[in-house]
UniProtKB/Swiss-Prot annotation:
This is Ubiquinone/menaquinone biosynthesis C-methyltransferase UbiE. GO terms for molecular function: 2-methoxy-6-polyprenyl-1,4-benzoquinol methyltransferase activity; demethylmenaquinone methyltransferase activity. SUPFAM superfamilies: S-adenosyl-L-methionine-dependent methyltransferases. It comes from the Bacteria.
Amino acid sequence: MSNQAENTTHFGFKTVQEDTKADLVAGVFHSVAAKYDIMNDVLSMGVHRIWKRFTVDCSGIRKGQKVLDLAGGTGDLTAKFSRIVGQTGQVTLADINDSMLKVGRSKLRDLGIVGNVSYVQANAEELPFPDNHFDLITIAFGLRNVTDKDKALASMYRVLKPGGRLLVLEFSTPLYEPLSKFYDFYSFNVLPKLGKLIANDSESYQYLAESIRMHPGQEILKEMMNSANFEGCEYFNLSGGIVALHRGYKY
């Protein structure tokens, strides 16, 4: 009985077997892929673009470098990094979900972003890249969906070059009680209804709200990064802590 308990994890507020979570998460993103970008704009009122711009500004990325945009979905960050690294650099858009990758590839090609971008279907816990390969790894709104976050952070550390940086952009814990109450009301009462209205899928957005609540808060995630051997770990609260950007280095 204890072994069974040890092999469980959270899927939103539900407790599930670890080996089933990836398939459950895949079902969510297969469902929302086609409407993912428009839902991001609607649900965040466009603010997600500001969060991502701040992430790019904190990246320190330069021309000619290699970037891994992990759980990169529809490619918002990949598009930005592609322009910065130029034709002598390389951006790898990786996602475990092939539906999201297809949407991202089509979108970036329509934007004329080709040549320095590659697409890889990959599990964050077992990245299929050489050691010490990337100058920068970003994972935006993806870590909370990973089954074994510690294993994923260790995998990211392995493929990052010495001197490289990891940036984790993720929903977090609001800093102020009034904001937290409003955020809870919006998350559990408005998000699912908008999901039903726009994407014909309320359950996936119910999962979104629940998965955010189960994700480690700012200090805990910082300690997890420290435990994965990242150094100089710090975080920046955005929008009152609704989102946080964590940054760590490999030396």
